[in-house]
A protein has these predicted regions:
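Transmembrane beta-barrel architecture of outer membranes
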Residues: 77-81, 151, 190
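Intrinsically disordered, low-complexity coil segments
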Residues: 47-66, 114-142
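C-terminal beta-signal and adjacent terminal beta-strands/loops
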Residues: 99-125, 129-136, 147-149, 157-190
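Extracellular loop and loop/strand-boundary signature of outer-membrane beta-barrel proteins
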Residues: 2-6, 65-71, 139-142, 153, ...
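Gram-negative outer-membrane beta-barrel transporters
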Residues: 2-109
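One-face residue pattern on beta-strands with alternating periodicity enriched for small/polar residues
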Residues: 33, 81-85, 92, 153-159, ...
């Protein structure tokens, strides 16, 4: 497999965030950090690259990415994050919430999202490399699971003394299965 550098990448976007602390009384506070990120991760040379790849006559010649879109590989357009911490006397309760939109493109070696009338040689190569169990392939897994996702972490703590405190944390509270790239399934609840 040969991998290519993108000759003309353009990534632009916007980020908005706010943070603060709400003090309800001397013993009770809520701190927050909220944010949103939008990016438009473009390969400015994608049209030329797609034309070159369409002209390939060697069925084993590698394409660069999983689809013909203008987007760079392994990027999501939207991310929303929230960190909230509530403190009452010696007790704390907090959460991290992250929502991300689907991944826009991945490596062609892993997945081919292009529409086609019949399988290509690379589809069989992928089955050999990554497996095909009862019709479940890396491609079918990716097609089903490359969706927007939200992950929630939860933490609780108690301050025993000035120097001693205990914290309990649950990552991925709802045990959401998500994948940011093929063959990299997220960690389950911990």
């Amino acid at each position: 497999a040969q991998f290519y550098n993108v000759s003309k990448a353009r990534i632009y976007g916007a980020e908005v965030s706010t943070n603060g602390v709400c003090t309800f009384n001397p013993n009770t506070t809520l701190s927050y950090n909220l944010g949103y990120v939008f990016i438009e991760p473009e390969d400015a040379g994608y049209k030329k690259k797609n034309e070159e790849e369409a002209a390939y006559d060697d069925p084993m010649h590698m394409k660069e990415k999983s689809n013909t879109s203008k987007y760079l590989k392994y990027r999501q357009k939207h991310t929303v994050k929230a960190v909230l911490d509530f403190q009452w006397k010696r007790l704390t309760l907090g959460t991290n919430i992250v929502w991300k939109s689907k991944t826009l493109a991945v490596d062609y070696l892993m997945v081919d999202e292009r529409a086609k009338e019949q399988p290509e040689i690379m589809d069989y190569v992928r089955d050999i490399l990554f497996g095909n169990v009862n019709g479940q392939t890396l491609h079918s897994y990716w097609a089903k699971n490359n969706t927007p996702y939200c992950v929630v972490d939860l933490r609780a703590g108690v301050k025993i003394t000035k120097e001693l405190s205990f914290q309990f944390m649950v990552n991925n509270l709802f045990n959401k299965e998500y994948s940011t790239r093929p063959m990299l399934v997220s960690a389950p609840r911990t």
